[in-house]
Amino acid sequence: MLEHLTLETFKEKVFNFDLNKDWKYEGTTPCMIDFYADWCGPCKMVAPILEDLQKEYGENLVIYKVDTEDQRELSALFGIQSIPSLLFVPLQGQPQMAMGALPKSTFEKAIEEVLNVKKPNIN
């Protein structure tokens, strides 16, 4: 089960915009944040892919979810206008946003290239 973020837990685990003007990731593991809504069909298509990715990458990657209906301030902070929108947050450097119901292979490529996380070998 992926962890859902509120405004408070986002500040604690991802970025405390009250304390920092410039981006500063608070986490110790690269993460993805899925901005979604329960009524969104494409979001429902992406959800099981994200669950699979979390299982496959284990402790090398954290995947969070943000309900855009419930967390409007957080959605506005990132200018979310279409969902699903996924924020890829590396340990160093700026986060990158991707939009739409992307295939698993595209997520895997972004995880490797943007987050610098290699897919673990499953024996």
Language-model features, listed with the residues they occupy:
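N-terminal targeting signals for export/organelle localization
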Residues: 1-11, 116-123
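Thiol-based oxidoreductase modules, predominantly thioredoxin-like and allied folds used
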Residues: 4, 35, 47-54, 58-73
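A short beta-strand-turn-helix
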Residues: 5-31
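Short conserved loop adjoining the S-adenosyl-L-methionine
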Residues: 21, 72-76
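Short pre-active-site segment immediately N-terminal to redox-active cysteine/selenocysteine motifs
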Residues: 28-31, 35-39, 82
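Cys/His/Pro-rich metal-binding microdomains
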Residues: 41-44, 87
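A short glycine-leucine-enriched loop at secondary-structure breakpoints
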Residues: 77-81
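Non-catalytic, surface beta->alpha helical segment in thiol-disulfide oxidoreductase systems
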Residues: 82, 87-122
